[in-house]
């Protein structure tokens, strides 16, 4: 029986987000730096496109629907002088994100402001356009609209509002459902690499769910789409830094294999979070964590190996044992 415990005891600490402005020298350019828009200025423009930014009244309604139905005292004090229709940014979000609603049907949305010429906007537009948008391998967060404001060199990515709480309040999921979630993570990686896109920030914190069995990648601030054969990235920084980048003083020789390493770490962290230590799954990650990136499998090879592995694991209906 393979030793299924070793990766959980040796996972590197998960550092905080570095943001796009700390990638390489190209990310120092304004086009790929983080946008901090004055949201009230774009309120009318977004309304014309059918989207409404959250107001004080929206926040109050959220609290009224909570378990105790009461609006917290700190919120009332903070917004004591505000009108109900004043904008109400979520203090837990960075300045480039804002919650809102699609006016046609009440769908809750997340809006992200980016530079019009940013790599992130180009990647999102590519992944969210037909035929890629409709490809079943594509597990990018559903994008409802892309609003461009050319005079300000800014764009708004309008996404469905999913949850970063990967395990629902109702409790843990079965092993079969856990495998289904992991497969979506692997499949989207294979899909991106097929189209010469490296995500470059694969981690649990960049994974969301709609609690309907769907999981999606977010945060393409560091992502790159490669047209040629030269793919090295100098001064590479990300959430999960592979060993070759540390050995090369931050240079990333193969972004695609860096994604593979980060995906292995995501899988092991997900196992720990969900309470599953499956020896077959641990074995799957071993080659993904090879120190030499050239020795790591491709995303498509990982997906194929995963699909062959799942039928060999018994009792997919079982629940995790946290004891």
Roles of regions detected by a PLM:
Residues 292-295, 301-315:
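Terminal C-lobe "cap" of eukaryotic-type protein kinase domains
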Residues 2-91:
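Juxta-kinase regulatory segment immediately upstream of eukaryotic protein kinase catalytic domains
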Residues 189-212, 217:
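Catalytic-loop of the protein kinase fold
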Residues 285-292:
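Short C-terminal capping segment of an alpha-helix within the protein kinase catalytic domain
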